[in-house]
């Protein structure tokens, strides 16, 4: 059971935990808990435009910057299984693009399971999509079959515009 905890990490849609830690303090805590050496994070910090926020309490960060702190931690940890709940919520355009790049690269390290209501994030990054309804898998799409139109159809999406 303990081994499974060390093989996964979750980035929640909204996370107010560790609010009295700075990002640097949070990193120290997490890498110690996961028994890992902290790698050089400069590329991730730059990629998410987070340079000026590393010494600010997590509670004082905007929703998007708090999300970036947890995403940077997740990608630096490189767990075998990474859960991302609504990963683009709160992110600016550039950080969203960088997130998509990181998700695509991550496939070399492990598996990402993410939930999203943003079709672009699904169609650009997914190898497999499960459309859920009332907690049950309604339809599955494999790589090459994933399109916004098919997902909309599976969701009975109607565009009233």
Protein language model annotation of sequence segments:
Residues 109-115:
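Conserved H-loop
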Residues 28, 38-54:
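Conserved ABC ATPase "signature" region
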Residues 93-94:
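Helix N-cap at the start of a conserved alpha-helix in ABC-type nucleotide-binding domains
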Residues 82-86:
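Catalytic Walker B motif of ABC-type/P-loop ATPase nucleotide-binding domains
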């Amino acid at each position: 059971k303990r081994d499974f905890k060390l093989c996964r990490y979750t980035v929640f849609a909204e996370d107010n935990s560790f609010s009295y830690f700075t990002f640097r303090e949070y990193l120290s805590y997490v890498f110690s808990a996961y028994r890992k050496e902290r790698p050089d994070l400069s590329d991730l910090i730059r990629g998410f435009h987070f340079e000026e926020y590393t010494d600010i309490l997590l509670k004082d960060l905007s929703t998007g910057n708090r999300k970036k702190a947890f995403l940077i931690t997740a990608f630096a940890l490189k767990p075998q299984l990474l859960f991302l709940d609504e990963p683009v919520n709160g992110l600016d355009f550039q950080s969203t693009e960088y997130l998509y790049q990181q998700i695509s690269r991550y496939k070399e390290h492990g598996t990402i399971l993410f939930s999203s209501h943003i079709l672009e994030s699904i169609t650009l990054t997914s190898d497999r999509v499960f459309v859920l309804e009332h907690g049950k898998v309604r339809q599955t799409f494999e790589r090459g079959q994933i399109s916004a139109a098919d997902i909309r159809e599976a969701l009975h999406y109607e565009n009233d515009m």
